[in-house]
């Protein structure tokens, strides 16, 4: 206790360690008329095998992050593990186990509504009859991703920003040329990153056919080995949505091959692909979600199967025929 400072001391000094800042948060919220409570957060996900031990015999080394929980209009907010670049309601311990100090009861920490870690990407492809394509890329950042990108772009020097933009453009396709500059907007939520490129030979014309690939390869599990002897631990869940809106070329409207709607599932995650087509447009939406899990070696091939299905050629290629 001798290492802890009073709230007034931390406020006057302008700095303090995590516990000092938690004490200050608690004092300020109490003075403002709220009813905060101290919570010790851990890095442990709420899995059955882990939760049982942690609740029965919580170890001090597992609960080392002092946080302050306050409920406003029925919504819980956790403070003290983010910075000035983060969205209020986000927490680095989303989905982790916590310990309420006053009651010594275990709890599960959650970010506020729409403040969990997530990313949404929108690709717009306008394909011409010659194969030249304009590709627009818009990314929306939520939760911890918002805070990280806001911090990154806020501190990025102009020269480094230009280099980042050049590298980002080159990742879209070989020979991509920027149309305008990079737009970033983090003074509102979610954070936005947006740019547009032209690619002369994005699509290939071969007689009466035209073909091209989606500008990305979806991935649910970044698995490496072909087999495992020990279980695979997925400590953190993820949520990503990738939407691709394709404006078809004037003369090539007959779709011969295109990604199909399907749902792929394995222990610890699901991938849902939705494909819709109109007279002049095709829209592909990939919804990818993983959850914390301990994957037994016997279930590991199911993960490989899902990843293989997402990476196969038929999951990203379009073949159009001239009408």
Predicted regions and their residues:
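A sensor for short, sequence-defined functional sites
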Residues: 1-323
């Amino acid at each position: 206790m001798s290492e802890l400072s009073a709230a007034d001391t931390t406020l006057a000094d302008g700095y303090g360690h995590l516990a000092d800042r938690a004490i200050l948060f608690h004092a300020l919220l109490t003075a403002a008329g709220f009813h905060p409570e101290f919570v010790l957060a851990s890095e442990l996900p709420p899995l059955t095998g882990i939760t049982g031990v942690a609740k029965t015999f919580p170890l001090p080394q597992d609960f080392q992050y002092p946080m302050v929980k306050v409920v406003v209009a029925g919504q819980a907010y956790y403070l003290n593990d983010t910075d000035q670049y983060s969205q209020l309601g986000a927490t680095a311990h989303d989905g982790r186990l916590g310990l309420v100090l006053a009651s010594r009861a275990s709890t599960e920490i959650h970010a506020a509504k729409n403040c969990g870690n997530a990313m949404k990407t929108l690709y717009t492809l306008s394909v011409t009859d010659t194969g030249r394509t304009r590709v627009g890329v818009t990314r929306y950042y939520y939760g911890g991703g918002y805070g990280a990108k806001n911090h990154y772009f806020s501190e990025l020097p102009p020269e480094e920003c230009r280099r980042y933009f050049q590298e980002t453009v080159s990742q879209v396709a070989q020979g991509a040329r920027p149309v305008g500059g990079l737009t970033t907007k983090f003074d509102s939520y979610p954070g936005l990153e947006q740019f547009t490129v032209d690619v002369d030979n994005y699509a290939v014309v071969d007689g009466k056919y035209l073909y091209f690939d989606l500008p990305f390869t979806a991935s649910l599990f970044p698995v490496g080995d072909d087999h495992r002897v020990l279980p695979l631990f997925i400590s953190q869940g993820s949520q990503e949505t990738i939407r691709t809106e394709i404006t078809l070329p004037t003369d090539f409207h007959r779709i011969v091959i295109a990604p199909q709607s399907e749902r792929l599932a394995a222990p610890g995650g699901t991938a849902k692909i939705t494909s819709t087509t109109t007279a002049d447009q095709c829209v592909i939406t990939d919804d990818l979600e993983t959850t914390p899990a301990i994957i037994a070696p016997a279930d590991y091939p199911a993960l490989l199967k899902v990843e293989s299905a997402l990476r196969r050629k038929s999951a990203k290629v379009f073949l159009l025929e001239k009408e």
